[in-house]
C-alpha cells in the first residue's frame, strides 16, 4: 500500500546529510526490491546513502545512473510514476562535491526535468545564499578554505558563475535563473500562488539558484515545489 503523496527521494553524497533527519528509511543499498519496500514506507522522505563525494567523477556518475535505473524499475513495479517522486541530489553546503555532474546525470537517466534547483544552505552552520551569492557566516565562500579543496576547489561564490565554472561552460551564467529572498518572503504569505506559477512555467531543465537566508524561506520554497 502506498501513500500517494509525492515521495521525496534524497540521493546523499556523504553520510552527514542523513544525520539531520529521522523517521524515514535510510538505504545503504538500492536494488529494486529494497527500493520497492522503501517506497511503501509511509514517510514522505526516503534517503539513499550513495557516498559519491568520495568517488571519482566517472564512478559518481555511474552510481547515480545505477540508482536512477533501479528507482525507475521500482516505481514501475509499484504502479507509480516518475512524477510521484521529487529527486534531491544532496551535496555539500560549501559547494564541494560533484554538484553539477550528479544532477546532470540524473537528468539524463531519470528525466527530462523542467528545472534543476541549486539550493546550497545549512542555516544552523551559517551557510546561506543571499542575492545569489553563497556565504559562510556572511563571508563569500570562495574566500574560505573550503574553496581551496584539492579535489573540488572553485573561484566564485556567485552561484550562477559557479555553475558555469563547474560545468566548464555547458551552463552559461546568463541562462541561470534566481529565486530571490524577497520572492520567498512573499511566498510565505499571500505570494505563494505567484511563486507556484513561476515554477510551473519552467521548462527544459533550466538551472535555478535559490536564495536561503531564513528557514521560513526554505519552507516557502518547499511548499511551492510540492504543490
Q: Where on the chain are the PLM-derived regions?
A:
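Alpha-helical scaffolding within the catalytic cores
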Residues: 28-35
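Acidic, glycine-rich loop-and-beta core segments that form the ion-binding/anion-interacting portion
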Residues: 225-227
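Short, Lys/Arg-enriched N-terminal segments with co-localized hydrophobic residues
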Residues: 1-5
Amino acid at each position: 500500500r502506498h501513500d500517494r503523496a509525492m515521495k521525496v527521494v534524497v540521493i546523499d553524497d556523504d553520510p552527514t546529510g542523513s544525520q539531520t533527519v529521522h523517521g524515514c528509511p535510510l538505504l545503504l543499498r538500492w536494488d529494486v526490491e529494497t527500493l520497492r519496500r522503501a517506497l511503501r514506507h509511509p514517510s514522505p522522505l526516503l534517503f539513499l546513502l550513495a557516498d559519491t563525494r568520495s568517488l571519482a567523477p566517472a564512478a559518481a556518475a555511474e552510481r547515480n545512473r545505477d540508482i536512477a535505473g533501479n528507482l525507475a524499475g521500482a516505481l514501475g513495479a509499484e504502479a507509480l510514476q516518475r512524477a510521484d517522486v521529487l529527486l534531491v541530489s544532496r551535496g555539500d553546503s560549501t559547494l564541494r562535491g560533484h554538484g553539477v555532474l550528479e544532477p546532470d546525470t540524473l537528468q539524463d537517466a531519470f528525466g527530462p526535468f523542467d528545472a534543476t534547483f541549486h539550493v546550497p544552505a545549512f542555516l544552523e552552520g551559517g551557510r546561506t545564499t543571499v542575492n545569489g551569492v553563497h556565504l559562510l557566516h556572511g563571508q563569500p565562500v570562495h574566500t574560505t578554505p573550503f574553496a581551496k579543496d584539492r579535489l573540488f576547489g572553485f573561484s566564485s561564490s556567485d552561484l550562477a558563475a559557479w555553475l558555469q565554472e563547474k560545468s566548464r561552460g555547458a551552463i552559461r551564467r546568463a541562462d541561470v535563473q534566481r529565486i530571490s529572498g524577497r520572492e520567498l518572503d512573499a511566498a510565505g504569505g499571500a505570494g505563494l500562488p505567484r511563486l507556484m506559477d513561476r515554477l510551473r512555467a519552467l521548462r527544459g531543465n533550466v538551472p535555478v539558484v535559490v536564495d536561503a537566508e531564513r528557514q521560513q524561506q526554505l519552507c516557502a520554497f518547499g511548499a511551492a515545489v510540492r504543490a
